[in-house]
Each structure stands twice: as C-alpha cells, then as structure tokens.
Amino acid sequence: MPRFALKIEYDGAPFAGWQRQREQPSVQGAVEAALRGLQPDHAGIAAAGRTDAGVHALGQVAHVDLARDWDPFRLSEALNAHLRPAPVAVLAAARVGEDFHARFSALERSYLFRLLVRRAPATHDAGLVWRVMNPLDVEAMREGAKYLIGKHDFTTFRSTMCQAASPVKTLDEITIEESPRDAGTEFRFHLRARSFLHNQVRSIVGTLERVGAGAWDPADVKTALEARDRAACGPVCAPQGLYLRAVRYPEDPFKPA
C-alpha cells in the first residue's frame, strides 16, 4: 500500500491540540476527515509531534497509507479542498518508502517561539504571539539560555504529566533574535533537539522571560536545572507563541527530484 508523507501548516487556536479527541476539535481529526473524503477506510495518520492546544505548526510532518498511488501534487490539492475552511493546509505531499515513519524516522525537531513586548494589544498577530508589557534584556536571556544547551536532566522543565520514559534530553540550540516592531519589540526563540519533553519549550521560554525582566539572574537558570524539581521552574508561558517549525529526516522527503 503506498505511503505518503505530508507537510502540514496550521493555526492551533481553534484546536484542542494535534491528537484526535472524542469531544473536541483536533488537527489530526481535521486531516483525517479530509482523508476520508478521498478514502473512507484509511487507517489514520501518524505525526512527528503532538502539539498542545493553541500551538501552531509551520512544518508538521505526518504519514498515511492509501490504497491509491496518488500523484503527490494532486493529493495535496485534494486534501486542501477537503480541509476548507479549517485553518490547516497541506504544504506538500511526497511518496515515501514503507519504512518511513513521521515520528520515529525524525532526526531533529525545531521550534520557534514568538514573544512580543508591547503595551498595545497585538491586533494582526492576536493568537500568534505571547505578549508581555515589561521590557526584556536579550543579553541576559541569552546568558541564561547557555546553561540549557547540551545533554541534561530536564525534570525542572517538563510537565508533571509528561509521559516520556526519561527526563534526559540533548538540547542542540537555543538562539534568541531581537527585532523592532511598531510600538514594541519581538523576540524570537529558536530551539532544536532530536525530541522534546511535554511543555519543555514553554517552560524554558517562560523562565528566560523572567531572566529578561530582571526577576531572575541568568545563573538562576542553572540552579533551577540542577534542582531537577518542577517546582523550581519559572512560569510556563502561553501556548499561542509556539510553532513547530520543521522536522528533519535522514533524507528530506519533500526535496524536489
């Protein structure tokens, strides 16, 4: 049975997360409903990551097995037609081998978090950024972030409901970009790792925001990390600024031939 990889973009605001839920709308549910328009008996899809309620994606990847050997372009066009008006888009489809798995074949996931410092409400970016009103020191946040790079026990920075077997993860990158915006400043946090713990990114960004605001010293991040205690974490920031940006594989399934 032909297997296809799908690159998916979505606005997470109206959804209870990626994962299919019985009583609430989900991104997985929307994509699977679109697939049923093409093949009513399809077996469902598997994704690279299960984003939480309100979290967005620029490059989520999922795979599906279909009875028909679709032309990838026609498959993406057909799915987008069935997805309307949901804020979900299939950016690309690709024929992949039967050993490809969207989750288990992934080498790296990258996330983007958008934080807007502005007293005025975010109008055009409402629901797409986390807005705070206090000024932030980007150099202090960068200094605090250095303590988190590398392989660590991230118990402090994961949800108490996290189901991962181990809290040990290797964080390959945290970079913070600062750029002026009308009546404010936007900070973009870029994080890369093979995989992340539940709420890890939001816990890290929420903690670094406290460093930027002057409520924490940069070295307090190291102390919190070494505590291996969820109670030592800073506040978990709002989900609407978080984006699953990209998923990397040994070979890019969407690379043009």
From Swiss-Prot:
Gene Ontology MF annotations: RNA binding; tRNA pseudouridine(38-40) synthase activity
Gene Ontology annotations of biological process type: tRNA pseudouridine synthesis
Broad enzyme group: isomerase
EC number: 5.4.99.12
Catalytic activity: uridine(38/39/40) in tRNA = pseudouridine(38/39/40) in tRNA
UniProt record similarity statement: Belongs to the tRNA pseudouridine synthase TruA family.
Protein name per its UniProtKB record: tRNA pseudouridine synthase A
Organism: Dinoroseobacter shibae (strain DSM 16493 / NCIMB 14021 / DFL 12)
